[in-house]
Amino acid sequence: MIRLSAAAALGLAAALAASPALAQTSATAVVKAGDGKDAGAVTVTEAPHGVLLKLELKGLTPGWHAAHFHEKGDCGTPDFKSAGAHVHTAATTVHGLLNPDANDSGDLPNIFAAADGAATAEIYSPLVSLKGAGGRPALLDADGSSIVVHANPDDHKTQPIGGAGARVACGVIK
């Protein structure tokens, strides 16, 4: 009886693990600065209508910084241009959370780094999904995606990137 119960439980666990309903619900990005130094981590958790980000960053210059989802899971170059443009839908969109037209899906609120260079925040984005739920762009698509931190804050209106400046940190979302 005990062997049968253990076998049934093992079979049930295997079936549940393969279930699409229990697909990956969170992902992590290990963030690096352009010089390769550790700059912290970002956890992205699937929510019913978007994603919740938990950012724990370090080594930033004090003050406000833009953060965006970028379309490629590639932080291989020191300037992080390999991460591509912002995540976006198939439709033509423009940059900026304050833009009256549809903004691109990579747009996020600014983050603030304290005097010691640390930035800790939770941000909700209804614009993306880990796997494409609700028709939102998938962060974990075939070429992946990344989170990029910029040198300056985003004004949320100016094209193409809101005056955010250079890319200073990047992490591939996995």
Swiss-Prot record:
InterPro entries: SOD-like_Cu/Zn_dom_sf, SOD_Cu/Zn_/chaperone, SOD_Cu/Zn_BS, SOD_Cu_Zn_dom. It is found in: Periplasm. SUPFAM superfamilies: Cu,Zn superoxide dismutase-like (SSF49329). Its EC number is 1.15.1.1. Keywords: Antioxidant, Copper, Disulfide bond, Metal-binding, Oxidoreductase, Periplasm, Signal, Zinc. Its main location: periplasm. Zn(2+) binds at residues 86, 95, 104, 107. GO terms for cellular component: periplasmic space. The keyword Metal-binding applies. It catalyses: 2 superoxide + 2 H(+) = H2O2 + O2. The keyword Ion transport does not apply. It comes from the Bacteria. Cu cation binds at residues 68, 70, 86, 150. Homodimer. PANTHER family: SUPEROXIDE DISMUTASE CU-ZN -RELATED. This is Superoxide dismutase [Cu-Zn]. It comes from Caulobacter vibrioides (strain ATCC 19089 / CIP 103742 / CB 15).
